[in-house]
């Protein structure tokens, strides 16, 4: 079974699109050198970002211009 599950992640966001954007933006920050905030054995930035979302380490703010 995949952890975290999509059902668990969907409780953290309002849509799958938001989840994809939030994970992609955080993964980009990690690639650019940001410190990871979740305990994760993976070296893959997208996996780390997904785990951070699941552990409520990061969140998003919806503005008129997009997700911040």
Curated annotation (Swiss-Prot):
One of its GO terms (molecular function) is DNA binding. The keyword Transcription applies. InterPro entries: DNA-dir_RNA_pol_omega, Pol_omega/Rpo6/RPB6, RPB6/omega-like_sf. It catalyses: RNA(n) + a ribonucleoside 5'-triphosphate = RNA(n+1) + diphosphate. It comes from the Bacteria. One of its GO terms (biological process) is DNA-templated transcription. Its EC number is 2.7.7.6. Keywords: DNA-directed RNA polymerase, Nucleotidyltransferase, Transcription, Transferase. Gene3D superfamilies: 3.90.940.10. One of its GO terms (cellular component) is DNA-directed RNA polymerase complex. The keyword Nucleotidyltransferase applies. The RNAP catalytic core consists of 2 alpha, 1 beta, 1 beta' and 1 omega subunit. When a sigma factor is associated with the core the holoenzyme is formed, which can initiate transcription. Belongs to the RNA polymerase subunit omega family. PANTHER family: DNA-DIRECTED RNA POLYMERASE SUBUNIT OMEGA (PTHR34476:SF1). Promotes RNA polymerase assembly. Latches the N- and C-terminal regions of the beta' subunit thereby facilitating its interaction with the beta and alpha subunits. This is DNA-directed RNA polymerase subunit omega. It comes from Ruminiclostridium cellulolyticum (strain ATCC 35319 / DSM 5812 / JCM 6584 / H10).
């Amino acid at each position: 079974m995949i952890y975290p599950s999509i059902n668990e992640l969907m409780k953290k966001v309002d849509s799958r699109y938001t989840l994809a954007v939030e994970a992609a933006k955080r993964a980009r920050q990690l690639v650019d050198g940001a410190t990871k905030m979740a305990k994760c054995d993976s070296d893959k930035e997208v996996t780390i970002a997904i785990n951070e979302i699941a552990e409520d380490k990061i969140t998003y703010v919806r503005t008129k211009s997009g997700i911040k």
